[in-house]
Amino acid sequence: MKVFILALLALAATTAIAQLETTCSQGFGQSQQQQQPGQRQLLEQMKPCAAFLQQKCSPLRMPFLQTQVEQLSSCQIVQYQCCQQLAQIPERTRCHAIHIVVEAIIQQQSQQQWQEPQQQAQHKSMRMLLENLSLMCNIYVPVQCQQQQQLGQQQQQQLQEQLTPCTTFLQQQCSPVTVPFPQIPVDQPTSCQNVQHQCCRQLSQIPEQFRCQAIHNVAEAIRQQQPQQQWQGMYQPQQPAQLESIRMSLQALRSMCSIYIPVQCPAPTTYNIPLVATYTGGAC
């Protein structure tokens, strides 16, 4: 019986996807003709996401399954396929892929029923769906694509100054703060905790698309500095161990700051960064 139910589910899902892909193909026909071959391939790959973003899905009618399993909707199936496709696309090209899809949808709808006020509302709705994709798929989907330009040396230096707390935290150059009171009501903060808070605050003020460049500039500065200091005269195997420690600290920052920090930067990256006031204080 279970095999029979699963077979019916698979059949219904396949039928729904086939119908959605037909609709997608018809809707994106003109857009695909105007795209480059690489973009056309991405559009083809992202059909489930296009169908989901356009909400071209409906409940699957399977009344005989109501008492056995929860009825799936074609949206749920398409969402799953969309997430599966996104996960297979490298992170650095994910933004480009999803925005090709959105642009195709917007161009199609602009040629159809949307007048100016309705079009703006539709664009806002599309943006919200895009942001929700990150949560639904549990993967990073940028809202804005990075432009392929290099940061200047002065901007990199400004970023490093701005992220001095992160440098201090990653190097673990902090120690317990002596607070004789109150020992029982609250835990004594450490200078590491203070610096971590400052680091997270500075990172949150940097636009999301520039955080990777910023945090990796810091890590690179630490890497270049350390061989000239404590690693001189020591065995080389200790240096990779230190770099691994920095990488682990970088990953820890993602959860501690509750903000997105890529572990690997797409290359090349980005453009002029709106910098906030740089950090000039001490550890506390």
Swiss-Prot record:
The keyword Disulfide bond applies. Keywords: Disulfide bond, Seed storage protein, Signal, Storage protein. It comes from the Eukaryota. CDD domains: AAI_SS. Residues 1-18 form the signal peptide. The keyword Disulfide bond applies. Contains disulfide bonds. InterPro entries: Bifun_inhib/LTP/seed_sf (IPR036312), Bifunc_inhib/LTP/seed_store (IPR016140), Glia_glutenin (IPR001954). Coiled coil: none annotated. Pfam families: Gliadin. Gene3D superfamilies: Plant lipid-transfer and hydrophobic proteins. One of its GO terms (molecular function) is nutrient reservoir activity. Disulfide bonds: none annotated. Seed storage protein. Might be integrated via inter-chain disulfide bonds within the glutenin polymer. Belongs to the prolamin family. This is Avenin-like b7.
